[in-house]
Every structure is written in C-alpha cells, then in structure tokens.
A protein has these predicted regions:
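N-terminal leader/propeptide and maturation segments of large enzyme subunits in energy/redox metabolism
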Residues: 71-77, 239-277, 354-355, 359-366, ...
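Extended redox/cofactor-interaction regions of prokaryotic respiratory oxidoreductases
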Residues: 118-189, 196-201, 226-230, 318-441, ...
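Long, contiguous, secondary-structure-rich segments that constitute the structural scaffold
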Residues: 475-477, 481-538, 602, 606-622, ...
C-alpha cells in the first residue's frame, strides 16, 4: 500500500505521520517513528485523522465548489473558478481604487502552510499596499512572541524537545499539556519515569489532567501569574539562588526588576494568588536548587490583557537563575497551532514583515521592498485581529478575506464579530469546510484543500521545519490555498500594476519556499543552508540553519549572546495588573475557557467523528459542587450564563477541578453545536461571553477571564431525540438540525458512537413552553420517526416516539417536563439492540428498564472505546498492579496514552 510521510494538522507539537493511501483515498494513518517530534506516537485526534478524510465525510462537510451570493440573505450558488476569481479580484481592485488599500482586511490562520502564509502576506503588503493582514495566531501566540522579543531580543524559542529528556524540574504554567499537547506530555511522563527524582510544578487555576501527576499544584486565582512569578523571584533573591555573575555579564535591567519584586513578599503574593505560603516557598526552593528547569507554558499565560507581562515575568526567572541556553533548561512556549510559528517566520501579521523583520523599522521595510521588487512597503501599522473586526463594524474595512479560520466561533465578543461581518460589503471565506459558522456568513466561498491534499512546510514549537505532503487529490474543485491566492493576485496585478513584472511567478510550493528562504539570509531564523531536497531526503530540520551549517541549532543562546543590540538579555520590570474585567456583585464568577482532550478548535474536523465526543459528550459549564449547592442547582440543571457581552444557556456540571467562585466552559462549543435564544436573542456559543480586551503590547485578547453570572434557566419543557443514522448522511443531517436551534431557549446537537456504518446523533432542546409541533415533526423526520410508534398525552404535554428496524431500536424521541425524560438514560442503552418489549410499554410514563442496567458513563479510552463503568468493573477485581491489570484486560491506555492521567486517578488508593 502506498505510504506518504507528512505532518499532523492539529497542535504545535508537529507530529510526523505516515499516511496510507489506496485508490486515491486515505485509508490509514500512524505515527512516524523517524520524526523527532513524536517518535511514532500520536494522540486520539492524530490517530483518527484518516477517518476525517473519508469520502463520506468530505461529501457532507467539505466546500466542493466556489459559491457566490449576489445579495445578503440570498442563498449562495455554485459558480466556476474563473468566475469566482474574477469576481473577487474585481471587487478588491475596485475597493482599493475607491477607498484605498486599508479598506481591505485579510484574516488568515496558523493552520495554513508556510507557503500559503507567504503569498497572502506578499499580496497584502506588497501588491495591495496594506498591512491589514493578521492571523488567528494573534489569539494564541502573540504574547509569547512579544515577550521573547522584549527579553531575548527576537521571537526565538530557546529550547527544544530534547530538553524534556534532560530537565529535573518541569514548570507548567497556563498549560494543560495532557489535553493540548498530549504527545509532548507523554514525553514528559516518560522522562519522569526514567528520572524519578525529577519534579513537576503546575500553575493553573483548575485541577487538570496535567495537575494529576504533579508534585506541586499552585492553584492560583485566575490572572495572578505575574504576582506569582515576581513572588518566586523575590524568594530566589532572598535565598541567594540567583547567579549574579551571569546577571552582570549577560543581562541588563536587573536593578529595576529587583526594586519592583522587593514589594512582592510571600504575604502579599499568597494573598493575591490564593495559595499557601509553604507552597510558594517550596516552589522557589525547587526552582532555586534544580539543575535544569524547563518551563512549559501556553494559552493560560498568553490569552490575557497582561499576556506579555506574564510571559516576560516567567522568562525573568530563567534569566536570574541561568536556566537558559543549556540542556534541560529554558522558557518553552508551546505553540497552539501546527504552523503559528511559520506565520511569524514569514511576517504574516499586522506588525511584522518577512523573516522576523519589524514593520516599524524603516530599514526592514526597505529590505523587504527590495526583496519583493516593489516600490515600498506601507508604514502605517495594520489592524490586528480584534481591531480588524472593529474597523469592519465601523465601516472602515469594506472587504474581509478570511482563510482557514472560523472567527464566528473563535473570536471573543461574538456580537462584535457578527456585526462586523454584517457591516462588511463583501465577506470572502476561503476554507476547506462549508459547515463552519463563518462559512455560513460568507458572500463568496472558495473551496480549499486540506490535510492530506496539500504540499508544503510547517514549523513546530521547537523551530523544526517539516514537510507536509499530498496523499490524495482534493475533493470536488477544492484547490491549494497558495494557488487560490496566486490566481487572485495575478488578476489584481493587471488592475493595480499593469505592465510590470509579476510578483507571483510561482508554479509550485517549492518555488514559494525558496523565495521565503532567501528572505531569511542574515536573520535570526536564517535557513539559507537548507534546501527543499534536504527536507525531502533528510527529514525535518531546525532553524537557524544558515548557509554553510551542517545542521540546525537545537538551543539558541548557548553562548549567552542574545539577539539584542547589546547582546545582553533584558529583564522586564513588568507591573502586576489584575484581569481586565473584575468580578462584582452583578457578575460574581470568573469564567475561563479551555480545551477538551479529544476536540480541537471549533471542531470543523474533529467534530465530524462521533467517537471524539465520547469523553465529553455535550456542552456544559463546570462549577464547584459547593457553588451549585449555594445556588440551589443540581448537576444537569440548565442555567443562563451571562456576561456583559452576551448570554448562553448550558447544563451545569459539578466539578471539583474548579474552585468556588470560578467556572469553566470548553472553548470548542460554538454555535455549530450549541445555541438557542435563552434571553430572547440568538446566542453564538461560548465566545458570546468572552471579552475583547487586548494586551497593550501583543494585542492579544483576554480569552481566559470573563466576569459572568449564573442563574437557573426557567425552561421546564424538554425535548431529546437520539438515534442511529447512516454515516453517509450523519453530518448532513446534523447541519439540517442546526437550522432548528432558534426555536428553543436551549438547543444542542452532537454526533456520537464508534460505528462506521450507523452513526449516532442526539438533538436536545429546552423551552419555556412546548415548541410548535411542526418543528418537532421536522426534527423527528431527520431520524425517520414520522411513522414510528407514538405515545402522546397532550394534557400532560408528553410526546414519545420509538422507531425499530429489523426488530432493533434505531431512534427515540421524548418530550415533556423534565421528569418525563428520566427514561433517557436507559433508553439510550437500547439503541442498536433488539427491541425487548413492545414500543408502547417502553414509552409509557413511569416505564422501567426491562432489565437492570448500569450506565456506561463517559468514554475514557477513545482508542478502544472503553467507558467508565467497564473500567470500574475491572478495577473491582484487580489485584496487584491495577493499571497493568486494566491494560491487559481492556487495552485502555496502551495506544496513544491520552487517557493515562484519568486512568491513574481512577485506581484504588
């Protein structure tokens, strides 16, 4: 069977994959044992990639042809590529000539390949003459990049994955790596197994799976990271655990920082952070006495109005103790997306230029103009992500071109985003998926190729450039992103710079990469020593890799010469500031958002597989059990979650992972899966609640903290439909069901199940009064329930349906007051099984299960479809090594390992 080596399209670990292809289709995927990022391992998401690339998925969710609508509110119609490209180029050129280039905004993505990114950036800044290009990496990595520049002089990650094998203290801050970077977390676990003396500290307001294996959990009050890091430095100074010779020889700005942290006494820090003094002192002791400290951090630091300060304050600790530039030591920013780093490398952000050049630097602008063959690169700063949508709402930006990202799900303050998209004169969406919330709002939809269909490169968290290779042709008329951009750019050239040499002479991704490579000469990320052939022959390579080098550099700054003008690292005396939105009597809870283990971003890809919902089947808001009790709520009660920007209705879930006064909602639950009109207005998923306050330096929004209130939702009438549907129609039917969300105060629809032939769907709704029968009939028709066995009681508001095929239960609908749906738990267990009793006996009020049942609970191990109840059954009889017994009998935890932290928590004490 033909095999193709490529790279996983999910997180920034950058795992190598081997794709198995047959008959023009991707039929399998496994980890590449030769790739240094993962050494053969894959997580649950990566190991199911081939299932997301099946034709039966593509035909339901992929954008397969260009589409255009001529008026808002009209349905888009398929058109040919030439018509689509001509239309886009004509509208952009006319807008530029009428309103100027800054009337255009391009919003791109860390999921694009480096070559895609490069041509987008060149089109914006070189051809159109606007710096209004930004990326969704602004939402995840810009604070990390800004802090690296402020302290080390350049956006250079000073560490590598090999450092995990060498560290003796792992310091996780704002990172649930067990979920967000699971393969990397497995490597940490393996390093600790080999070195039992190594310790782990986790700084996180929540008790996550990453915390479960930690030696010390600093469960700080959300947003107090800077105070914590200053407090640690205060203690390191007090105990003499800093290296004054290094500070004197290789850094600057220490006096100002020392004066600042003098005030951050243990008493003050423990009060601000809500932690114990002895834990603060112990953390400082472990750091100060460690041989090699590796800090690993992510969105918990970055997604904050103080994100740059949080990053810089952590880097201060490394500089003060010389925990940088040597094996096992350094501040390691874990990239959220597969090519967020590649976007920074090519300068595809509103404040950057090619090869880490600064837009504000006149010499850098002149260099790029010469390299590109244009008269000038514009000087005016571009609009960053949130600012771009604000400008569109004000009418300053007339055309938005959105590529490979879903801002109508992922951006904060969704009301702003929706108003911006409505105000723009033209919204162009270039995406592989037609099912995203943003695609639904597009005037022009350009179908793009996706994973397994593209050719190019990406750069992962450790600065390693990997090849992405094509294993099959894109479905329908979809095209590679760079080809779409180049085709539009060539049309624009004829209007905007007629008669001049083409800026876009490329015939392949390699052509683009070679030009990008040439722009890096003499820069901190110099890759002029690399060739396309070398990447093909020798595999992934790290930068910098200048001309004449025999290999890339694993650890920059080993010589303690930093990328500043003086060659010295800069301490950052950053003040502590509380979150942008304080809690108060009206909004007394601190809301955080974050990841689920088996989902990724808005779920346009992972959301196509029911099996990836097994671990977290439906949306909810997590609250501490005592918080629920204080509010007279029970698990499962529907609640209004309201911020100053919007509202959302969700079921409440009890979780001791959060503290009193705090709440958590997974970031993946957008309007594609959960909505309604609980407050008599449409809701737009979790980011209807989040705040668009920006970090003053990085312009990254504060997605990790919003003040909210929670009140019981008075929606006494409930409705649920669940059933098996043909896998070839599951996602198409889910999209059809989404159209009915607005009829309910609360509604959600998610897939479930592992069966590849018969997939599962569940639709759940709630309302103040019974929803119109015609709506229910339309929903039930999707499940084939129109001629099913029925039991109705109009007086009591009850409605039940059950459909069987060949004597097996296929679909069930239940409606009525909350108590009428109590049978759902055991009725769900009948799906796909022989009908045990006549349907009317199963549906009648007060019916009991025909046989004793134990609800399976959540799926803990997705690889082998192992549920909680089964694990507890086996553990009840386990002797000796309970984990080994579990793995031998159920296989859970023996494949990707993502479930291991949870399995260990379930073991008997």
């Amino acid at each position: 069977m033909p095999e193709v080596r490529s790279t996983c399209p999910y997180c920034g670990v950058g795992c190598g994959v081997i794709i198995e292809a047959r008959g023009g289709e991707i039929v399998g995927v496994r980890g590449d044992p030769q790739h240094p990022a993962n050494r053969g391992l894959l997580c649950t998401k990566g190991s199911t990639l081939h299932l997301t690339a099946r034709p039966l998925v593509a035909q339901q969710v992929r954008a397969l042809a260009p589409e255009l609508r001529t008026a808002r509110g009209a349905r888009r119609q398929p058109i040919d590529w030439d018509t689509a490209l001509d239309h886009v180029a004509e509208r952009i050129a006319t807008c530029v000539q009428k309103h100027g280039p800054d009337a255009i905004g391009l919003y791109v993505s860390g999921q694009l390949l480096t070559e895609d990114y490069y041509v987008f950036n060149k089109l914006a800044k070189g051809l159109l003459g606007t710096n209004n290009i930004d990326t969704n990496s602004r939402l995840c990595m810009s604070s990390a990049a800004t802090a690296y520049k402020q302290t080390l002089g350049a956006d250079i990650v000073p560490t590598c994955y090999e450092d995990i094998d060498c560290a003796d203290l792992f310091f996780f801050a704002g990172s649930n790596a067990a979920y967000a970077h699971p393969v990397l977390f497995r490597r940490v676990e393996e390093a600790r197994r080999r070195n039992p003396a190594a310790k782990t500290i986790v700084v996180d307001p929540r008790r996550t799976d990453t915390v479960s294996g930690a030696d010390l959990h600093l469960q700080i009050v959300p947003g107090t990271d800077v105070a914590l890091f200053h407090g640690l430095l205060h203690l390191l100074l007090w105990e003499g655990w800093v290296d004054r010779r290094f500070i004197e020889a290789h850094t600057e700005g220490f006096a100002e920082l020392k004066a600042l942290v003098r005030e951050f006494t243990p008493a003050l820090v423990t009060q601000l952070c809500g932690i114990r003094t002895e834990d603060l002192v112990l953390a400082a002791q472990w750091w100060g006495q460690a041989r090699a400290v590796l800090s690993l951090y992510c969105q918990g630091l970055n997604q904050s109005a103080s994100g740059t300060a949080k990053n810089a304050a952590l880097i201060n600790l490394h500089l003060a103790t010389v925990q940088i530039g040597r094996p096992g030591a350094g501040p390691f920013s874990l990239t959220g997306q597969p090519n967020a780093m590649g976007g920074r490398e090519v300068g595809a952000m509103a404040n950057l230029l090619s090869a880490h050049r600064d837009l504000a630097n006149a010499e850098h602008r002149a260099e790029v103009a010469r390299l590109w063959g244009v008269e000038r690169v514009p000087e005016a700063p571009g609009k960053t992500a949130v600012e771009m949508f604000e400008a569109a709402r004000r009418g300053e930006i007339k055309i938005l071109w959105i590529a490979c990202t879903n801002p109508a799900q992922s951006m904060p303050n969704q009301r702003l985003v929706r108003e911006a998209l409505a105000a723009a004169e033209l919204v162009i969406v270039q995406d592989a998926y037609r099912t995203t919330a943003t695609a639904a709002l597009a005037d022009v939809l350009l179908p793009a190729a996706s994973w397994g269909e593209k050719d190019g490169t990406v750069s992962n968290s450790e600065r390693r450039i990997s090849r992405v290779r094509r294993a099959m042709a894109p479905p329908g008329q979809a095209r590679e992103d760079w080809r779409i951009v180049v085709d539009i750019a060539r049309r624009l050239q004829r209007r905007l710079r007629p008669g001049r040499p083409s800026l876009f002479p490329y015939a392949s991704a390699e052509d683009i990469w070679l030009e990008h490579r040439d722009t890096t000469r003499g820069r901190d990320l110099d890759i002029t020593g690399l060739s396309w052939e070398m990447l093909e022959r020798d595999g992934p390579q790290q930068w910098p890799f200048p001309d004449g080098a025999s290999s890339g550099r694993s650890r920059p700054f080993e010589d303690h010469v930093f990328a500043t003008v003086s060659g010295k690292a800069r301490f950052a005396a950053v003040p502590y500031r509380p979150p942008a939105e304080p809690i108060d009597a009206r909004f007394p809870l601190r809301l955080a958002t974050g990841r689920l283990r088996d989902q990724w971003h808005g779920g346009s890809r992972t959301g196509t597989l029911g099996r990836l919902f097994g671990h977290a089947p439906e949306p909810c808001i997590e609250l501490h059990p005592a918080e629920l009790a204080r509010r007279q709520l029970r698990p499962g009660d529907l609640v209004h979650v309201t911020s100053r920007r919007g509202s959302l209705v969700l079921p409440a879930a009890a979780s001791d992972a959060v503290r009193m006064g705090e709440a958590f909602i997974a970031m993946h639950w957008g309007a594609e899966f959960v909505a309604g009109c609980g407050d008599e207005r449409p809701t737009f998923g979790v980011n209807a609640l989040t705040i668009d306050a920006l970090d003053p330096d990085s312009r990254q929004p504060e997605l990790k903290h919003a003040a909210v209130r929670v009140q019981k939702a008075e929606l006494p009438w409930r409705y649920v439909v669940f059933g098996q549907v043909p896998a070839s129609r599951q996602l198409e039917l889910q999209l059809a069901l989404r159209a009915h969300f607005g009829a309910f105060g609360y509604a959600c629809c998610v897939p479930f199940g592992h069966d590849d032939a018969r997939a599962g769907l569940v639709f759940r709704g709630a309302a103040a009064t019974p929803v119109q029968v015609c709506v229910l009939q339309a929903i039930e028709q999707v499940f084939g329930l129109e001629d099913a066995a029925a039991l109705d009681d109009a007086r009591r508001g009850l409605r039940s349906r059950l459909r069987a095929e060949g004597g097996h239960v296929v679909a069930i609908a239940l409606a009525g007051p909350v108590e009428a749906l109590a049978a759902e738990v055991w009725l769900r267990e009948l799906l796909g099984r022989p009908l045990p009793l006549p349907a009317h006996r199963l549906l009648r009020p007060g019916a009991q299960p025909p046989a004793p049942t134990v609800p399976p609970g959540r799926i803990v191990c997705n690889c082998f479809d192992v549920a909680e109840a089964e694990i507890r059954r086996v553990l009840a009889t386990a002797n000796g090594n309970a984990l080994a017994h579990l793995q031998a009998e159920l296989k859970c935890g023996t494949n990707c390992g993502a479930c291991l932290p949870e399995l260990r928590r379930m073991l008997p004490a």
